[in-house]
Amino acid sequence: MGSVSNQQFAGGCAKAAEEAPEEAPEDAARAADEPQLLHGAGICKWFNVRMGFGFLSMTARAGVALDPPVDVFVHQSKLHMEGFRSLKEGEAVEFTFKKSAKGLESIRVTGPGGVFCIGSERRPKGKSMQKRRSKGDRCYNCGGLDHHAKECKLPPQPKKCHFCQSISHMVASCPLKAQQGPSAQGKPTYFREEEEEIHSPTLLPEAQN
């Protein structure tokens, strides 16, 4: 009977092995596609604060020194820090990264020991701020260039044309603005008068003689 029991046991094991589910091809492909996280350390090679990305110079991988260093792409969204996220050139970092079709890409970037990154002192200059500065700030109450209307010390002034300073009409219906060419539009009358006086031949000594 012992031999019969052994045969039954062997047969049961074989049957169990046959019934064991095999790994689906989809699961195997998914496991192969999942990025393998690697650990590295190094410094920030460069970082563009306006674009929000740069490259790390990896000097060690999994505790093993690399010579020469290897570049690893970094995006601001991967930085472990508060507030505006950026990196300072030469800043020491630790990070996890993966291999992609484009190269090495960082997954999470911290300072040494997992602390917050220091970040760059630079801040991007917004286009809206540059446009606002180029046009200049003007007080809509008195026309002054050194303050805003809310800071004006004069009482409320009557509304007037910002082009010729006349109170009889607004800038949209200004006859002088309509007569001027595109190059003169946007310049108040007193600016144009000063330019005309500067370029007038009556002020030149040769013309007076």
Swiss-Prot record:
Keyword terms, alphabetized: Acetylation, Cytoplasm, Endoplasmic reticulum, Metal-binding, Nucleus, Phosphoprotein, Repeat, RNA-binding, RNA-mediated gene silencing, Zinc, Zinc-finger
The protein's assembly and partners: Monomer. During skeletal muscle differentiation, associated with translation initiation complexes in the polysomal compartment. Directly interacts with EIF3S2. Interacts with NCL in an RNA-dependent manner. Interacts (via C-terminus) with DHX9 (via N- and C-terminus); this interaction occurs in a RNA-independent manner. Interacts with TUT4 in the presence of pre-let-7 RNA.
A Pfam family of this chain: Lin-28A-like_zf-CCHC_2
Record note on what altering W46A does: Does not affect localization to P-bodies
Role summary: RNA-binding protein that inhibits processing of pre-let-7 miRNAs and regulates translation of mRNAs that control developmental timing, pluripotency and metabolism. Seems to recognize a common structural G-quartet (G4) feature in its miRNA and mRNA targets. 'Translational enhancer' that drives specific mRNAs to polysomes and increases the efficiency of protein synthesis. Its association with the translational machinery and target mRNAs results in an increased number of initiation events per molecule of mRNA and, indirectly, in mRNA stabilization.
Domain CSD: residue ranges: 39-112
GO biological-process terms attached to the record: cellular response to glucose stimulus; germ cell development; miRNA catabolic process; negative regulation of glial cell differentiation; negative regulation of pre-miRNA processing; negative regulation of translation; positive regulation of cell proliferation involved in kidney development; positive regulation of cytoplasmic translation
Phosphoserine PTM sites in chain numbering: S3, S120, S200
Gene Ontology molecular functions: G-quadruplex RNA binding; miRNA binding; mRNA binding; pre-miRNA binding; protein-RNA adaptor activity; RNA binding; sequence-specific mRNA binding; translation initiation factor binding
Induction or repression: Can be negatively regulated by the interaction of microRNAs miR-125a and miR-125b with at least two miRNA responsive elements (miREs) in the 3'-UTR of this gene. These interactions may reduce both translation efficiency and mRNA abundance. Negatively regulated by retinoic acid.
Tissue and organ expression note: Expressed in embryonic stem cells, placenta and testis. Tends to be up-regulated in HER2-overexpressing breast tumors.
Residue ranges covered by zinc fingers (CCHC-type): 137-154, 159-176
Gene3D superfamilies in the record: Nucleic acid-binding proteins, Zinc finger, CCHC-type
Additional observations: Overexpressed in primary tumors (overall frequency approximately 15%), overexpression being linked to repression of let-7 family miRNAs and derepression of let-7 targets. Facilitates cellular transformation in vitro, and overexpression is associated with advanced disease across multiple tumor types. Reactivation of LIN28A expression enhances tissue repair in some adult tissues by reprogramming cellular bioenergetics. Improves hair regrowth by promoting anagen in hair follicle and accelerates regrowth of cartilage, bone and mesenchyme after ear and digit injuries.
Modified residues (N-acetylglycine): G2
Family: Belongs to the lin-28 family.
A single GO cellular-component term on record: nucleus
Transmembrane segments: none
Alphabetized InterPro entries for the sequence: CSD, CSP_DNA-bd, Lin-28_RNA-binding, Lin-28A-like_Znf-CCHC_2, NA-bd_OB-fold, Znf_CCHC, Znf_CCHC_sf
Name of the protein described by the UniProt record: Protein lin-28 homolog A
Listed result of changing H169A: Abolishes ability to suppress pre-let-7 biogenesis and localization to P-bodies without affecting pre-let-7 binding
Region (Disordered), start-end ranges: 1-31, 178-209
Subcellular compartments: Cytoplasm; Rough endoplasmic reticulum; Cytoplasm, P-body; Cytoplasm, Stress granule
